[in-house]
Amino acid sequence: MNAAIDDVLALVRPDLQAFAGYSSARSAAAQGEVWLNANESAWANPADAAGSSRRYPEPQPLALREGLAALYGVTPQQLLIGRGSDEAIDLLVRALCVPGRDGVLVTPPVFGMYAVCARLQGAALIEVPLVDSEDGLRADLDAVIDTARARNAKLVFLCAPSNPAGSDIALDEVERVAVALRGQALVVVDEAYVEYAQRPSATTLLVAHANLAVLRTLSKAHALAAARIGTLIAAPELIAVLRRCQAPYPVPTPCAELAVQALQPAALARTAERVTTVIAERERLRAALAGLPGVCRVYASSGNYLLVRFSDAQAAFDTLLAAGVVVRDQRAAPQLGDALRISIGSPEENDRVLAALSARRAAA
């Protein structure tokens, strides 16, 4: 084991470094024809026509691991599959942060689950706000590095592209943060929306930087939000530790089977086509919104959404709702007291957004 891996494993809570975890019946490498080791029913439920649900699922389904590894350009040993990225975030915080001692650094306004998991674990929440400029709401990475060092951050979450801001972080900047915090913190890049950013993934940096981890999901571009297939990609040694901290059966069989089908070439080709459509619609909607009265600013976005500031965000929200369009009210988030986040829908759905907002201004 090399020094870089040793440094990362040293970030794991001391009481969990030798933790064996729960050994489920399915994790045993036994072979046989009659399976009587897990107290499962010998008969399928009448509602289960295929009879596949009476057995516990594989803890980390092999076909899905191999498919995700191929999709993300990594090895299966670098993957941990969980119930959405939320589970991976929670596992990281619980496995690395000692309550009352360690901290989790976030860059608000940002995805809220980082803060939720930190607070549930009793870890200090360290905030380095995004900076609003002509280039958008962007992470101040110098401040991230300095604050992480000064305040004992064990985990640093970089949301790239950022939700809800839409700004991205260049890979050389991600690498700079990882180098600066080597031996002190694990830098976690949340790439839930990276398919829309049209850049290489931070997974390309993992070989050189053991204190880097990447979150990916099938919920967004791959349109499988209900299946809850999230993936943490990191050094195999760290993945092994986190697997011991994970619940024994995190991936239901129907979800795994659906995800494997979604990773077949034909499905991936259709997904790529839809990503192209979303990017084109994002830019069309951005330009059209920017020309509407009452719209103060539409931020450039590398995700499948737009952050929009309004002169009267409540009126805009109510107008859209009256037209049957539900968007995300961001006004409770730091720095976003006048903002809504609008997901990029189909061309017809985006036209409804524009029609509703245009009609409101015409009637005013």
Curated annotation (Swiss-Prot):
* Classification via Pfam families: Aminotran_1_2
Cofactor(s), by name:
pyridoxal 5'-phosphate
Q: Which CDD domains match?
A: AAT_like
> What Enzyme Commission number does this protein have?
2.6.1.9
Q: Which pathway, metabolic or otherwise, does it act in?
A: Amino-acid biosynthesis; L-histidine biosynthesis; L-histidine from 5-phospho-alpha-D-ribose 1-diphosphate: step 7/9
Question: Mind listing the UniProt keywords for this protein, alphabetically?
Answer: Amino-acid biosynthesis, Aminotransferase, Histidine biosynthesis, Pyridoxal phosphate, Transferase
Q: Name one GO biological process term.
A: L-histidine biosynthetic process
The record's GO molecular-function terms, alphabetically, read: histidinol-phosphate transaminase activity; pyridoxal phosphate binding
Spell out the InterPro entries in the cross-references.
Answer: Aminotransferase_I/II_large (IPR004839), HisP_aminotrans (IPR005861), PyrdxlP-dep_Trfase (IPR015424), PyrdxlP-dep_Trfase_major (IPR015421), PyrdxlP-dep_Trfase_small (IPR015422)
Q: Where are the bilayer-spanning segments? A: none
* Reactions the enzyme catalyzes: L-histidinol phosphate + 2-oxoglutarate = 3-(imidazol-4-yl)-2-oxopropyl phosphate + L-glutamate
Which superkingdom is the protein from? Bacteria
Modification type N6-(pyridoxal phosphate)lysine: residues? 220
Q: What's the subunit arrangement here?
A: Homodimer.
Q: Which NCBIfam families match?
A: hisC (TIGR01141)
So what family is this one in? Belongs to the class-II pyridoxal-phosphate-dependent aminotransferase family. Histidinol-phosphate aminotransferase subfamily.
Write down what this protein is called: Histidinol-phosphate aminotransferase
